Amino acid sequence: MLCLGASASASALISRSAPAANEKFGLYAYGENLGGLSLFYADGLAYIGDPANSTSSTASSVSFKRESDSSSSWIANPNGTTKAEAGWSDELLYIPSSSSSDHQMGFTSSERSNETTSGFIFYGQWVMVELESGDISSSFYVREESEGKGVYSLLWNVTDEETAIPISLRSVEPSNA
């Protein structure tokens, strides 16, 4: 009986809600052999892993914020460096639009026709995308890159690639962080 009581009170301490409006948050990938690697920026694209292992000179950890609880566009800024050092700020996270042949996710300061910067939602701490059709999807994948050891491209809606690994994106840091 004591064990159950301890478990119940310990689980009550863990927040299960989405980050609040204007609260900074990071995103972490969980999947096969991926126990909470962080999302980072490099050359305008989204990657998973340690930015220190990236070969890009613009690699930077990212913090996001939503301007309101109903906002489905997420604003990214460098986390841990000054905006001047990073060379970018206030970029929107995007998924490739359904008309795009590319699956790589990234960051943009102004949405182009082959990019979708809205529709990002939380289900608790799990990231989902509400599509134009009204369907909700979490079709996130990663593929190991030559960009650096332990660095993965963050992909959207990959259905025809054997090297892509399905993942979940969450706002929860791994317990070993």
Where in this protein do the model-derived segments appear?
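Cleavable N-terminal signal peptides of Sec/SRP-targeted secreted and luminal proteins
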Residues: 1-12
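Generic low-complexity, intrinsically disordered sequence content enriched
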Residues: 6-8, 17, 68, 97, ...
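Extracellular glycan/ECM-engagement signal in secreted proteins
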Residues: 13-47, 99-177
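Short, well-structured hydrophobic secondary-structure segments
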Residues: 52-98
